[in-house]
Amino acid sequence: MYINTETEDLKTAIDAIRKAVKDRIAPLAAEVDDSGVIKPEIYDLLWDLGLMTVTYPPEYGGSETNPGTLLCIGCEEIAKACASTALLLIIQAVGSFPLMHGGRKELLDRIAPRIVNNRELAGYLVSEPGAGSDVKAIRTKAVKDGNDWVINGTKCWATNGPIASFYSCLCRTKDDKGVQGYSFFLVERNTPGLSVGKIEHKMGMRGSQTSEVILEDVRVPAENLLGELNNGFKLAMKDFDMSRPAIAAQALGISEGAFAQMETYSRERYTFGKPLCEHGMITQIIADSAALIEAGRGLIYQAADLYDKGKKNTKLASMAKFFMGDAAVKITTDAIQVFGGYGYTHDYPVERMFRDAKLTQIFEGANQIQRIVVAREIRDEQSK
């Protein structure tokens, strides 16, 4: 089933996002990549558009309808020009999810208005040096001490690590070899014992700041527990069902941006007396890329639609992520090929888009893991 993302109730939002991308975000994309910094006014723009809180409960600034779809639309449209900026939407949604959908009302009433009013950035502390896609391998521990929990461990690949005001931190709270025994806690940046470690210098999405976050005897009150004790793994999996379509939408946007660049160039560049687009091998690249984009769009917005309706979308979310992530790497690689030597230089955006696309195959569960998830979901469906 194809989901029409340009129905009347979404068109106003889409038009506003597209205008912001054209006028404000696209002109700065190369500078963001070169400097590794997104300017404060771009953060404010995303807040003003409502994209930083779109997946929050409505009472805290979220969308009453279609939050997953709107998140995907924002990621797709922005990533056409700047994938680093699109990543801000994803990490805000991911890092806030355990709080917004697992925090107790008293905690939410105290924290959420401050986050929205002060425009505070979220971080997500799950990955560790020995635990990436294998979430169950985390070693960061939280130990109960009176009315507090004391956290010790090192987290890595923390998007927004150096600049977040608060983090959702997954810890081991019970020795258990299965999925039980993990819990999320809200940890605020100014908590004693929390420090930022190594800042990563990445291949792509350089405008998004990524670092280690070190927790040494970090003490948080018991009320900062997010979700049920020892059931954090389940909350993390629900978070993935929201984030994976959004990452796929980011990959879709990168692909569309690269496609637009190479299709235009193929019409303007002449070789052997005719435009590139009239050479057989180039027409195949154009056609294959267009087909991948359309197929990926269908998967993405179907997964987002299921999420918005409160239905299980795990299989489609993982399908969308691995399909579109792999497609983005292929499309951006082919775009460089169409540009030839020019595409290999920093002077044309397809080089940046290629570097950005690679991350969509890796984060929020590597694409190899996504295939395992899909196969497991199919087995479960057939056994019912």
From Swiss-Prot:
Q: What is its EC number?
A: 1.3.8.11
Q: Which UniProt keywords apply?
A: FAD, Flavoprotein, Oxidoreductase
GO biological process, alphabetically ordered: protein tetramerization
Please give the catalytic activity noted in the UniProt record. cyclohexane-1-carbonyl-CoA + oxidized [electron-transfer flavoprotein] + H(+) = cyclohex-1-ene-1-carbonyl-CoA + reduced [electron-transfer flavoprotein]
Q: Which domain of life is it from?
A: Bacteria
Whether Isomerase counts among this entry's keywords is no
Q: What class of enzyme is it?
A: oxidoreductase
Pfam families in the cross-refs? Acyl-CoA_dh_1, Acyl-CoA_dh_M, Acyl-CoA_dh_N
Q: Which GO terms describe its molecular function?
A: acyl-CoA dehydrogenase activity; flavin adenine dinucleotide binding; oxidoreductase activity, acting on the CH-CH group of donors, with a flavin as acceptor
Q: Which cofactor does it need?
A: FAD
Subunit and interaction comment = Homotetramer.
Similarity field:
Belongs to the acyl-CoA dehydrogenase family.
Its biological function? Answer: Mediates the conversion of cyclohexane-1-carbonyl-CoA (ChCoA) into cyclohex-1-ene-1-carbonyl-CoA in biosynthesis of cyclohexane-1-carboxylate, a by-product produced during fermentation of benzoate and crotonate to acetate.
- Name the UniProt record assigns to this protein: Cyclohexane-1-carbonyl-CoA dehydrogenase
Species whose genome carries this gene: Syntrophus aciditrophicus (strain SB)
